[in-house]
C-alpha cells in the first residue's frame, strides 16, 4: 500500500502542530488547535485552509463549451469568461458522480474542480465524454496547490497582497491574478457559508502564498483551519457532502438541488432523460435539517423515527453546531414527515432522541 501524498504545505502544517488524517490518498491537516476555535474563527474573522487534495481538470479547445454541456448537467456554454458555476456530473441513470465547480477561464478553456475522493473518477469520465468533441482533456491536479481564506475578514487579509480590486470580484467569479507576487487563479468561492477566496497557485509558490496570508491575517484574527471544522462549517451552511447527502444512487433532485440541472439547454447530455423524468415526480424522501436540544448529536447512518418509533429516514451528516450551540443534522426523511416543525426522533445507540425538522440552511451569513 502506497504512503499518502503530502501537500506542498506539509512542513508548515507540522510546524503549526497540526493533527493529520489520511483522506483520499492524502495526508491532510485535520485540526491545529481545536475544532471549535477554528470553526469560530471562520465565522467571526477568517480561517486559512490547505485544499490541495482537490482535483483539477482542464477542458479546452474549439468545442470545449459543447463538450461540457454534454458531460455535465450545467449549461457550460452560458458561463461567461471569468465566472464559475456549481454543478454536477451524473451517470446515465441521473445519479450523482460528484458535485463540481466549473470555472470558465477563456472562450475555449474551462477548469473543472472535483472533490478529492472522486477526482480520478471525474477525470476518467470527462476524458471519455469529451473525446467525441473537438476538445481536449488534461488532468492538471499536480500543477496546482489550493489555498482558501474564508471568513468575514477575508477581503481585509487578501487585499494588501494583490493588485486586484476585490470589490469587483463577484461571488462565483474566478480569473487569473497575482497574490504575494505569485501567479494565481483567484476565485470568490468556498465551502463554509462565509465570504472568502480560493487561490489556485503552483506547488512551488504555495508556501510563500500561505505565509503571506498568515502574516497579513495576524492582526485580523486569522487561524489555520483543518478539515474537521470545514465539515461543521459546511453542515451549518446546509452544503452537501458527497458520500453523505450525494451519491450515485441519488439524483440532484433528492438533495433539493434540481436547480443545477439545466434541462432546457440545447442538445443532449449524460443522464438527461432520467433527470427529466425525476423533475416531474417528487422524490419519496426529502433532504431536511434536524435540530435537537439534547446533548448527543445525530451522526451519519443513524435511523430517523417518527413519533411512534417507525423508521422513516436516515441521518446523512450530524454534529454539534459551534455557532448555534446545539446539535444539528441533515437527513433524508419520507416526504410526509419533512415539514419544518415536525417532531421526530433519532435512534442514537438505542436511545430515541427527540429532534425537530427545520429549514435548511441552519446558518446564513449576513450580507
Swiss-Prot record:
Give the matching Pfam families.
GCV_T, GCV_T_C
**Parts forming coiled coils:** none
Q: How does it associate, per the subunit comment?
A: The glycine cleavage system is composed of four proteins: P, T, L and H.
**What's the protein name?**
Aminomethyltransferase
A single GO CC term for this protein reads: glycine cleavage complex
The UniProt entry's sequence similarity note says: Belongs to the GcvT family.
Q: Which Gene3D superfamilies match?
A: Aminomethyltransferase beta-barrel domains, Aminomethyltransferase fragment, Probable tRNA modification gtpase trme, domain 1
Tell me the enzyme class: transferase
BP GO annotations: glycine decarboxylation via glycine cleavage system
- EC nos: 2.1.2.10
Q: Which UniProt keywords apply?
A: Aminotransferase, Transferase
Q: Which organism is it from?
A: Saccharopolyspora erythraea (strain ATCC 11635 / DSM 40517 / JCM 4748 / NBRC 13426 / NCIMB 8594 / NRRL 2338)
Catalytic activity of the protein: N(6)-[(R)-S(8)-aminomethyldihydrolipoyl]-L-lysyl-[protein] + (6S)-5,6,7,8-tetrahydrofolate = N(6)-[(R)-dihydrolipoyl]-L-lysyl-[protein] + (6R)-5,10-methylene-5,6,7,8-tetrahydrofolate + NH4(+)
For this chain, one GO molecular function annotation is: aminomethyltransferase activity
Q: Does the keyword Membrane apply?
A: no
Amino acid at each position: 500500500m502506497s504512503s499518502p501524498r503530502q501537500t506542498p504545505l506539509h512542513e508548515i502544517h507540522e510546524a503549526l502542530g497540526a493533527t493529520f488524517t489520511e483522506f483520499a490518498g492524502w495526508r491532510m491537516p485535520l485540526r491545529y488547535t481545536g475544532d471549535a476555535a477554528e470553526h469560530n474563527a471562520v465565522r467571526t474573522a477568517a480561517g486559512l485552509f490547505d485544499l490541495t487534495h482537490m482535483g483539477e481538470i482542464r477542458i479546452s479547445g474549439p468545442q470545449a463549451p459543447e463538450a461540457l454541456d454534454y458531460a455535465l448537467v450545467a449549461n457550460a456554454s452560458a458561463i461567461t469568461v471569468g465566472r464559475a458555476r456549481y454543478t454536477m456530473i451524473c451517470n446515465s441513470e441521473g445519479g450523482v458522480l460528484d458535485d463540481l465547480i466549473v470555472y470558465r477561464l477563456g472562450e475555449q478553456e474551462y477548469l473543472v474542480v472535483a472533490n478529492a475522493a472522486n477526482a480520478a473518477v471525474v477525470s476518467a469520465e470527462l476524458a471519455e465524454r469529451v473525446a467525441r468533441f473537438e476538445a481536449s482533456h488534461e488532468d492538471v491536479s499536480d500543477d496546482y496547490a489550493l489555498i482558501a481564506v474564508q471568513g468575514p475578514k477575508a477581503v481585509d487579509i487578501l487585499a494588501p497582497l494583490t493588485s486586484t480590486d476585490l470589490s469587483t470580484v463577484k461571488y462565483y467569479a474566478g480569473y487569473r491574478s497575482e497574490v504575494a507576487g505569485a501567479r494565481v487563479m483567484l476565485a470568490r468561492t468556498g465551502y463554509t457559508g462565509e465570504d472568502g477566496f480560493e487561490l489556485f497557485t503552483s506547488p512551488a509558490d504555495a508556501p510563500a502564498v500561505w505565509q503571506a496570508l498568515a502574516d497579513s491575517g495576524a492582526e485580523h484574527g486569522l487561524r489555520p483551519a483543518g478539515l474537521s471544522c470545514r465539515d461543521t462549517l459546511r453542515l451549518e451552511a446546509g452544503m452537501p457532502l458527497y458520500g453523505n447527502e450525494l451519491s450515485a444512487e441519488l439524483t440532484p433532485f433528492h438533495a433539493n438541488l434540481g436547480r443545477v440541472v439545466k434541462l432546457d439547454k440545447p442538445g443532449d447530455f449524460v443522464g438527461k432523460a432520467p433527470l427529466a423524468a425525476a423533475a416531474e415526480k417528487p422524490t419519496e424522501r426529502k433532504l431536511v435539517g434536524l435540530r435537537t436540544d439534547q446533548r448527543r448529536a445525530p451522526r451519519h447512518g443513524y435511523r430517523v423515527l417518527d413519533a411512534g418509533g417507525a423508521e422513516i429516514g436516515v441521518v446523512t451528516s450530524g454534529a454539534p453546531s459551534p455557532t448555534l450551540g446545539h446539535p444539528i443534522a441533515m437527513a433524508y426523511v419520507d416526504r410526509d414527515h419533512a415539514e419544518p416543525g415536525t417532531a421526530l426522533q433519532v435512534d442514537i445507540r438505542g436511545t430515541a432522541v427527540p429532534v425537530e425538522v427545520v429549514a435548511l440552511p441552519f446558518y446564513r451569513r449576513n450580507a
